[in-house]
Amino acid sequence: MVTEPLTKPALVAVDMRPARRGERLFKLAASAAGSTIVIAILLIAIFLLVRAVPSLRANHANFFTSTQFDTSDDEQLAFGVRDLFMVTALSSITALVLAVPVAVGIAVFLTHYAPRRLSRPFGAMVDLLAAVPSIIFGLWGIFVLAPKLEPIARFLNRNLGWLFLFKQGNVSLAGGGTIFTAGIVLSVMILPIVTSISREVFRQTPLIQIEAALALGATKWEVVRMTVLPYGRSGVVAASMLGLGRALGETVAVLVILRSAARPGTWSLFDGGYTFASKIASAASEFSEPLPTGAYISAGFALFVLTFLVNAAARAIAGGKVNG
């Protein structure tokens, strides 16, 4: 039997140039998209700095330590951000301290304890809270929450007044227009952000780690404590910083709640005054004149830098593993 020799299949040349060209175009488009956010941030920073410098040069007060903010006379500008920083920091940190433990608890409940028929609608309700307008939170805070908090504020002031956070502030406790009230309202506002991100991070905990812990006899709480929470640490930090960013920049709700103060702040939760954002919003009518406008833009630039420092600190705390 004669067998025919095997013949090699003919090689067909494939032109890879269109694919390579498409890859280059896609890489260029992706790089351009990635560069857009960097360019936008740089442009914003340059705009703020350029508009702020003339007013800073004309300023007759120390920008960082002065409690004045007088822009009524172009020739005698005197403004500083000491009180703005104090009110912003106290209200935002109060919100963070109150919101994060509750948000983490809700996230753990939704991912590891709640039955599915309850988890989804409850999670949707938490997410829906983020859609409530800021002005609604502000009105609810000053008309509903503030009167309820007044007895608590008086109790804290009476019994813990020796501690600087609870001593008598620069506004009356009556009416509740204090940092204490603003911080609690802000904690409700940032709750959905921290909860939503923490929930998604906890859901990504490797199933094999959870099953291994259960196989070793761990209870559900021990699984959460030793597996879920350590795995989601950097995600919770990232969520907290996003919530803090929201609190730092919140304007309308804080403007509605906080009572203006005639005296400098004392680093008490029972002080009134303005945050960076609410001070800028309250003076929109002055933005027709360059130098007074520049004074408020200077405050905006300080807030801009503060948010960057907060995010840098978050990455350092999370060991560089903060996502987002």
UniProtKB/Swiss-Prot annotation:
<dbReference type="GO" id="GO:0005315">
    <property type="term" value="F:phosphate transmembrane transporter activity"/>
</dbReference>
<keyword id="KW-1133">Transmembrane helix</keyword>
<feature type="domain" description="ABC transmembrane type-1">
    <location>
        <begin position="85"/>
        <end position="314"/>
    </location>
</feature>
<keyword id="KW-0812">Transmembrane</keyword>
<keyword id="KW-0813">Transport</keyword>
<dbReference type="GO" id="GO:0051701">
    <property type="term" value="P:biological process involved in interaction with host"/>
</dbReference>
<dbReference type="Pfam" id="PF00528">
    <property type="entry name" value="BPD_transp_1"/>
</dbReference>
<feature type="transmembrane region" description="Helical">
    <location>
        <begin position="125"/>
        <end position="145"/>
    </location>
</feature>
<keyword id="KW-0472">Membrane</keyword>
<protein>
    <recommendedName>
        <fullName>Phosphate transport system permease protein PstC 2</fullName>
    </recommendedName>
</protein>
<dbReference type="GO" id="GO:0005886">
    <property type="term" value="C:plasma membrane"/>
</dbReference>
<feature type="transmembrane region" description="Helical">
    <location>
        <begin position="30"/>
        <end position="50"/>
    </location>
</feature>
<dbReference type="InterPro" id="IPR035906">
    <property type="entry name" value="MetI-like_sf"/>
</dbReference>
<comment type="similarity">
    <text>Belongs to the binding-protein-dependent transport system permease family. CysTW subfamily.</text>
</comment>
<dbReference type="InterPro" id="IPR051124">
    <property type="entry name" value="Phosphate_Transport_Permease"/>
</dbReference>
<feature type="transmembrane region" description="Helical">
    <location>
        <begin position="90"/>
        <end position="110"/>
    </location>
</feature>
<feature type="transmembrane region" description="Helical">
    <location>
        <begin position="237"/>
        <end position="257"/>
    </location>
</feature>
<feature type="transmembrane region" description="Helical">
    <location>
        <begin position="174"/>
        <end position="194"/>
    </location>
</feature>
<keyword id="KW-0592">Phosphate transport</keyword>
<dbReference type="GO" id="GO:0035435">
    <property type="term" value="P:phosphate ion transmembrane transport"/>
</dbReference>
<dbReference type="InterPro" id="IPR000515">
    <property type="entry name" value="MetI-like"/>
</dbReference>
<comment type="subunit">
    <text>The complex is composed of two ATP-binding proteins (PstB), two transmembrane proteins (PstC and PstA) and a solute-binding protein (PstS).</text>
</comment>
<feature type="transmembrane region" description="Helical">
    <location>
        <begin position="290"/>
        <end position="310"/>
    </location>
</feature>
<keyword id="KW-1003">Cell membrane</keyword>
<comment type="function">
    <text>Part of the ABC transporter complex PstSACB involved in phosphate import; probably responsible for the translocation of the substrate across the membrane.</text>
</comment>
<dbReference type="InterPro" id="IPR011864">
    <property type="entry name" value="Phosphate_PstC"/>
</dbReference>
